Amino acid sequence: MSAGGEHLKDEGTRRQVVLAGGIAGLISRFCIAPLDVVKIRLQLQIHSLSDPTSHAHITGPVYKGTLSTIKTILREEGLTGLWKGNIPAELLYVCYGGIQFTTYRTTTQLLAQLDPHRLPQPIESFISGALGGGIATAATYPLDLLRTRFAAQGSGDNRVYESLFASLRDIAKTEGTVGFFRGCSAAVGQIVPYMGLFFATYEALRPVMATAPELSPIPLPPGSGDAAAGIVASVLAKTGVFPLDLVRKRLQVQGPTRALYVHRNIPEYRGVFNTMGLIFRTQGLRGLYRGLTVSLVKAAPASAVTMWTYERALKLLREHEIAAGRDE
């Protein structure tokens, strides 16, 4: 964290923010990729785990919890199965991180010019976070859809797409442009409040958490306060909007390939409200929160790594530019 508890909007040039955001996204994605695959598999599973008769006729795998799912994937698909969809996901996280942090910084700077009628700091952070998340999600959504489809497909002869370029060609040919944006409304509807809540909470906790390493009875690495603030903010925000995340995943695998993924019994859904209503009627409220545990397990370290890496990368970029200026 920056000295003096600066807000994110006050730090770095536009180029530095883009680079730091991209680096943070790249590293964060690689670290949490296995948990992302597990989350997607659990979210696409429609049968009840508490009722064995509901999956008596299921031909695909039955996943029961995070550790069980990891073991099943390792046994049936090998270690690489836990990194399925990582290429589009890495592209997604790099682009998303750069766009998100740039939009956040730009929006907060624009809002700061409203003096003497400035909004309260938490509201500024919420608006900036919501805009950053919404714009980044819409701009990178095709990569998000590809990430989900690759994570949901089987191995060997059961693969739906052979490569990233093959998936782009096949979706464009069989589903058209609209195929790349299935579930986009649910994604934006989820990410806007999520990122608004995340950044508002993060900015509020950041100055408080900055003193945590100094007060700790054991030595903590630099940036621990940033990581802790990211964890708390992520868990609180993720829980509130999780049903829309699940709806997004169900919609992303619709289309002509719907019955070809690991879960071959995915129902046909039409629209956000239709999907949410059908899940609630057939699986209850619990069905809308399927995969929440692994999602929180994933979101906490992902946000911690993202914010820690972003702060460290931005600091290094700023120091490098200052040093380069002195040498000129």
UniProtKB/Swiss-Prot annotation:
Name of the protein this chain belongs to: Mitochondrial thiamine pyrophosphate carrier 1
UniProt GO cellular component terms: mitochondrial inner membrane
GO process terms (BP): thiamine pyrophosphate transmembrane transport
Topology within the bilayer: Multi-pass membrane protein
This protein's UniProt keywords: Membrane, Mitochondrion, Mitochondrion inner membrane, Repeat, Transmembrane, Transmembrane helix, Transport
UniProt function note: Mitochondrial transporter that mediates uptake of thiamine pyrophosphate (ThPP) into mitochondria.
GO MF term (any one): thiamine transmembrane transporter activity
Taxonomic lineage of the native organism: Eukaryota, Fungi, Dikarya, Ascomycota, Pezizomycotina
Transmembrane segments: 17-37, 79-99, 126-146, 185-205, 227-247, 291-308
Solcar repeat windows: 12-110, 120-208, 221-316
Family classification: Belongs to the mitochondrial carrier (TC 2.A.29) family.
